[in-house]
Amino acid sequence: MIIKKTILMTLFLLTSFFAAANIKLPHIIASRMVLQQKSECTLWGKADPNEQIKITASWGQTAQTTALQNGTWSVKISTPEYGGPYYIDFAGKNVLRISDVLIGEVWLVSGQTNMEIPMVGWPPYDTIQGGAQALAAADNDNIRFVMLQQKASFDLEEDNNCWWTKATPENCKPFSAMAYFYAKKLYEETGIPIGVIQCCWNGCNTESWIDLETVKTVPTLRNAVAEYERCKPLQKQLEDWVKSHKTITLNSDWRKRYDGVDFFDKEAARLSYADENWKEMELPCYMDNREGIGSFDGIVWFRKWVDIPIEWVGKKLILSLGPIDDMDITYVNGEKIGETLGDGKWNHSREYEIPAETVLSNEMVIAIRVIDCGNGGGLCGVKEALCIYPEGEEDKAINIAGKWKYLPTAEYKDGVFYSYDLKTREYYNRPEVPVVLNMKTISAAYNAMINPVKNYTICGVLVSMGESNVGRSTEYLKLFPALATSWRTAFKNPDMKFYFSQIAPYPYQAGESQCMREAQRRCQALIPNSGMVSVLDFGNRYGFHYAQKQQAAERFAAWALNDVYGKKCEVSGPEFSQMIIKGDKVFLIFSHVEGGLVCKGKHLTNFQVVDAKGVAYDAEAEINGNVISVWAQDCKSPKNVRYAYKDWVDDVTFYNGAGFPASSFTTEKKLIDTAEY
């Protein structure tokens, strides 16, 4: 589920050049970058101790500094009003020049998959509405972006392997669709060059993006902090052990990364391979935290002997495996029968044909190489989806869920696969660490992704996260403001704009998305200089990811255009502000009513009234000017109102005249982490 555009030769030359020089710059300070206009921007890097460094910018600014004893240096340089391109010279014992630098507006975008999904989407399920047309026209030298490498660390890191690029149809393919549409809208409205720092990681927990000292202020995470600090030295031992193994070389073309790759484990596919010493796992399941494997990213083989009816011998069969997170190459009796490779296929069901000539007896062995690059991993559907049957005779299917043999043969860390010896089952010698380092570990993404760029001057941030924290909504009232505090401290900008979107409706197993949306709604009042985007009307019943990235991006842009760029406009849907109860009716007053309150449908939907015992009744509602009256025939003494307060909402009709939907809300004061109302 990770997309990276790899330009290996360019990167090799770039890093080699810097490595050979006395002056060294972090990856984010490079040609094609965008610097924040009319600001005191920080430039920094490394040099020899006590080396004198002079910075000369072609817009007429200079600065001088001396490297400290540890070789680090930094300077402030004034930037003019937007324009360019410019160059900057760094002169010490050697001279470096970075060129094609624009002055404009810089935004950092961060979050989970809805912010990360690229312009090409993850078809066939996760597509971008209007994406193909927008991508074809995405040729704008004034929109530039840098994608930070997804990485987790226990230690504060100084650099992140990334590079700036310009918006072209090819370059934009792996770039965040939400971020591109946001930058496009800002540029169209202002004419100012836009730079975007993409800092996303699907499946991340919010606490992973917060620095450790700030995490310590969240009471519910104290035990996690203690465990984190205890395991930090153990993690170093594990990383050293993992990285002592040989690496698996992937293809340089990100679209064909895994095609024909040698994983050094093909023997595991053989019919005669001896797997009696492998451990067993019940499938289907996510591999995370299963006994014997824990939270693991990499390659895991699964094998199972299956008995089939004798009359099936010599017939074409269908093997159904359900969805596999992320990718797979599947074999039967040692012959490859199918594969699903590439990004965004983690929730795609697998059905492969077994050729008749492969079905030689009433016994067969199924071997699956699962490639997991993040999050849960494994055969993760329902039991009924794991089956085998003759073509056209699904009613005769034999279920193959249950115990499978398994063995991890490679581990994925920091974008690299490290191979474990298949013959010696080397994985079983892997050092154990109670806290697994990944995108869910407290402070891990902050350390490796935010800390390396915290000196870069930005205008503000866009955030779309919270899905991985569903079920912890009460905690989120402290956790999410802590994120804003952490980043404003890191970027040394206490008033930095902080715009965020709610999670979209989705039928979570626990039925708690409405609680998270309510926590996020309340966070807007807890975070100064923030703005919230409602995507209540973009829910996708079949996945977390919605297709309307352009519309969501333009809702984000409305906040920036109004707050930062002086384009006075509505920024939000109707926002509940006051409740008045008169008899059996409740009257709701709203702010953000530009163009009046609007019903986009035959009538307002999704309203409920709640009595003193907390019992909710479906209610009728009508608009009277900027007030909505709500009532239910079976509730004569209403005490509270809920709007769209359920995990799945698909009939949204409540908007303002500017076209923004209202957020779901409840007037109840207590936020409860449960779906049982």
What are these regions (language model features)?
Residues 278, 306, 312-334, 366-368:
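Aromatic-lined ligand-binding clefts that engage carbohydrates, nucleic acids, or primary amines
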Residues 587, 592-677:
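C-terminal beta-sandwich/jelly-roll accessory domains of carbohydrate-active enzymes
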Residues 60-83, 323, 331-384:
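Beta-strand-rich ligand-recognition modules
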Residues 83-93, 365-368, 639-645:
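Short, aromatic- and glycine-rich surface loops/edge beta-strands on solvent-exposed regions
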Residues 21-49, 99-109, 116, 282-296, ...:
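Non-catalytic, glycine-rich low-complexity segments
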